[in-house]
Amino acid sequence: MKQEYIPLDEFPNKSNEGMLNDEGTSSSGLSTRTRSLELFDNMEESGSFPKVERKIQSLLDELAEVLFQSKQPNDLTRIRKAIAEQLQLWCQACQENADLYRSQQRKLKSRWDSQTDILSQIESTKASLAEVHKAEEISNLKTSITHLDEEIQILQEKLAIVTNQRNTLVKRLQTYDNLEKKKALSMEDRLLTLQEQYDAHANVSSLEKRMEVLKKREDLLRLMVGQALPGMQFFQRLIHQIQAVETKLISILGPTSLSEAALPPLTDVQRTSVLSLLTSTLHSLESARQIADSNTWKPIIVCLELEIVYFENMLTAITSTPVSS
């Protein structure tokens, strides 16, 4: 069951859990750098987009550098927005490829219909040709001629009448023979032409297999886009909430206070307020990470782990800062 998203401000204050250990990893024991390297390992079958994915990876590395090496903290908003924009581009690319696969399927379907129609014509022509060869009229005429020949020998007095009948029937036979021969030749030529047309292109079975592959790719990409869009909305809301927390911290500690080295001495009231805000924020981030884990939003999981470590470090720094008189 997927977890429901809860805004940062609605979480109750809890004591900090999951502080960094001596080796710079979270309490889960998973290095955020290692997890970021695994983001796009399983996307080959759906048609990945290396340029966008490498850009996302680069932004994640840059975010980690800014958060943990105290370099240009003012770039946090830019980096977070850039990550969101790249994820949106990735979704759009998936959508465009899915539409392309659908277009290719339609073209193959048209060719499939054409080949199927040719097959139908071939079968119909074969059936008609078989009927021509089995026509009973030719057999009946030949039988009548044989009977008349026998009657000529027996009934000499009726020779003239029988001869006329025979001549008439012979002419009819010749007429039928000529017509049927022409019809048979025409049908044989038609059959040969249709067979050549069919053999000149991919057969129906091959087209069906290619259509099936394209349909699977389209379905997979559309599924990935459908799964990624909620993650995008979730990540954008999270960015706004983190920025709101930082604004509150700056209002309490001063404009340069987000760097650990620049923390000013705090009064007891300031210290209590900041610790409460950081503890609540960490609890909210942990819950958000569980939601991302349950939905397999890998880039967002890495971002959340970086933010958690960043706020845990700040909490540690605030805890060790002496109280100002």
UniProtKB/Swiss-Prot annotation:
Residues 23-32 have a biased composition (Low complexity). Residues 1-32 are annotated as: Disordered. It comes from the Eukaryota. The keyword Coiled coil applies. Keywords: Coiled coil, Cytoplasm, Cytoskeleton. Its main location: cytoplasm. Signal peptide: none annotated. The keyword Cytoplasm applies. It is found in: Cytoplasm; Cytoplasm, Cytoskeleton, Microtubule organizing center, Spindle pole body. Residues 135-223 form a coiled coil. Disulfide bonds: none annotated. One of its GO terms (cellular component) is nucleus. This is Uncharacterized protein C1685.04. It comes from Schizosaccharomyces pombe (strain 972 / ATCC 24843).
